[in-house]
Structures are given as C-alpha cells and as structure tokens.
C-alpha cells in the first residue's frame, strides 16, 4: 500500500488545477486519470471561451497543456481507475484496478458523463460503431454526405447539430417540446441553418438497424432509422437516418461515493457553500461532479483551485502538511 498526502481522482480541468496548486504547495499529489483522461474536454472541438486563447484552442490540446504543466511541478499521474473508496476513517483507502493506496486528503474531480436515452440500443450501438455517438467532434467526420439526427434541446444539442452541418446533408434536431432550451444566440443560428430540420414534440422510442458486412466479412448492426413518438398526439413515425447523436445532458460520476457522501437527487455531490469541503473532513470535491449549474471548463478549473487550497489548509491544521 503506498501512502500519499493528497490523492486527486480525475483529470479534467478541475483535477488538473487541483494538482497544479497542490504540487506547487509541495504536497506531491498523486492523480488517478480514470477511464476518460482529460475528461469531457477531450471530446469537444474548439474551446473558444477559455481565457487566454484568443484564437480558441482544441479541447484535447488544452488538456495536454494542463497535463504538461502539472507534471512540471512534480505531480504523479497514474493511468488507473479508482474502483473503491473507503472514506470512513483517515487515512482514506483507495483501491484501483492496479493497487491499494492511502491518502491523508482526497480531492474528488470525477466529473460527469453523457447520458444515454435509456432504450439500451443507443449505448450498445455507440460502443460497436453502429452509428450512434455522444460526441459530434469525435465522430462527425464519419457521417460526411449522410442524413443524421441529434436528440436534445439544450446548448450542447444545438452546438452538436451546428457542428454536424459541416459533414451531413441534413441534421434532424429531435426535441420533446416545441421550443429549444438553448441560449437565444444558439437557437437563432440553428433555426437559420437550412441543413437543420427541427422535429418538434418527438421522442426516440427505438433505434432500427440493418445488418451490414464489413470489407473483412464481419457482420455489424448499423442504424437505418429512428422510431419516433409524438409527445402531443402519441402517433408514431419512422425517420430514416444513418447516424444518431445523443445530447440530453450529463450524469455525475459519483457511484463510487454512494452511501458515504451526501448527494442531491440527481447524484451531484453536496459541498459546503462557498467551499469545496464535503461533510467528511479531508475530503473535497470540485468540478462538474459538484456543479450542475455552470459546468464550464473555467469554473471547473476555478473550483479545482479552491479544493487544493482547502486541502492544503486542512492538512496544515492537522499537522500533516510537512
């Protein structure tokens, strides 16, 4: 079992900023990357709203810069996923897919993940290359010259739809209501774009597939149409598309802490107002895992800084900072 003063779980802007501050405070943090190193920004295109990059910067490039920066100050990064966290007594015990660790302080920066529609097939097809995705930036290119659909009505859905018009011949924007939740500027851009066809008051009931044979002779299921249900009159229709992008929100990655830390009804961690402290002394949370309101790269980074300073002060109070 290896012991560390500070362990940070997660490597988005929050985790990396927490690592930056704790490493500069000589606390030699250990960071676990988890299943999605770099977090949600690794599946976005250009980030144009992060201060200091007047031309914008690609999400993955921004995370690479942050990674290099924390390594420079002596952070240790391990590509391991935490499977179990015992926060009942200090030092806290963490079990990863590769070993056992203990820590005086834990900073939780596990972020949030894209939600699926709960019809089963969407998530399965996303893993098997069946034409379903939660990331337009990653997969948009594969749908050049095809007709596709985006499900959702918020900023993310509209942003994905607009981005996909670069590749697709037509983008059907499927929303369960008759108006979008996205910001006014986004809505105007989308509704002006002749490639975007809104499908109001519709939900996806099923993903219909056809079997294709790959050049290697393998059989794969690929999307051929969506079965839609009208939310007003209950009628059904079929929409032929070759791709589906799901953009219906996010789920905080907090199952690891169930029964140990308080969460709100949607699973976001609760922290003391104006700080990163959880009810367990020595355990701090930052980034999207505790923020369902702002969810921006810059606010995640800011809260990572808060968590690092809170952790540093707490360790000093306990006489554990030296």
Q: What is each model feature region?
A:
Residues 3-5, 79-80, 144-146, 201, ...:
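Phosphate-coordination loops involved in phosphoryl transfer and adenosine-cofactor binding
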Residues 4-73, 158-184, 264:
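Beta1-alpha1 glycine-rich phosphate/pyrophosphate-binding loop at the start
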Residues 70-96, 101-103, 165-273, 313-322:
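A Rossmann-like FAD-binding core segment of flavoenzymes
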Residues 11, 34, 137, 153, ...:
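Cofactor-binding loop segments of dinucleotide-utilizing enzymes, especially the Rossmann-like FAD-
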Residues 12-13, 36, 112-114, 155-156, ...:
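Residue-level detector of alpha-helix initiation sites
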Residues 113, 123-142, 246-294, 303-306, ...:
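FAD-site-proximal beta/loop scaffold in flavoenzymes
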Residues 77-141:
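Glycine/small-residue-rich loop that forms an oxyanion/phosphate-binding "nest" at active or ligand-binding sites
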């Amino acid at each position: 079992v290896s012991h560390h003063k500070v362990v940070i779980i997660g490597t988005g802007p929050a985790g990396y900023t927490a690592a930056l501050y704790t490493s500069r405070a000589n606390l030699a943090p250990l960071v676990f990357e988890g299943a999605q190193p770099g977090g949600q920004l690794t599946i976005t295109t250009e980030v144009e709203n992060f201060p200091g990059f007047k031309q914008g910067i690609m999400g993955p490039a921004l995370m690479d810069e942050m990674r290099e920066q924390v390594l420079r100050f002596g952070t240790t990064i391990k590509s391991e996923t935490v499977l179990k966290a015992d926060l009942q007594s200090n030092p806290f015990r963490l079990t990863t897919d590769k070993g056992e660790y203990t820590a005086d302080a834990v900073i939780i920066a596990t972020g949030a993940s894209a939600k699926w529609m709960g019809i089963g097939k969407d998530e399965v097809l996303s893993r098997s290359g069946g034409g379903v995705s939660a990331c337009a930036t990653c997969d948009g290119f594969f749908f050049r010259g095809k007709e596709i659909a985006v499900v959702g009505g918020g900023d993310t859905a509209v942003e994905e739809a607009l981005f996909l018009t670069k590749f697709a011949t037509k983008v059907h924007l499927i929303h369960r209501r008759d108006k979008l939740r996205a910001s006014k500027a986004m809505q105007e851009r989308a509704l002006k774009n002749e490639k975007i066809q809104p499908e109001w008051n519709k939900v996806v009931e099923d993903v219909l597939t056809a079997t294709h044979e790959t050049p290697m002779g393998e059989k794969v299921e690929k999307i051929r149409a969506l079965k839609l249900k009208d939310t007003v009159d209950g009628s059904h229709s079929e929409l032929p598309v070759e791709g589906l992008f799901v953009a219906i929100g996010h789920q905080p990655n907090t199952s690891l802490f169930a029964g140990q830390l308080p969460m709100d009804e949607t699973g976001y961690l609760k922290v003391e107002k104006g700080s990163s402290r959880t009810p367990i002394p020595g355990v701090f949370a930052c980034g999207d895992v505790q923020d369902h309101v702002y969810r921006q790269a810059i606010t995640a980074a800011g809260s990572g800084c808060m968590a690092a300073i809170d952790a540093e002060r707490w360790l000093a109070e306990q006489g554990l900072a030296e």
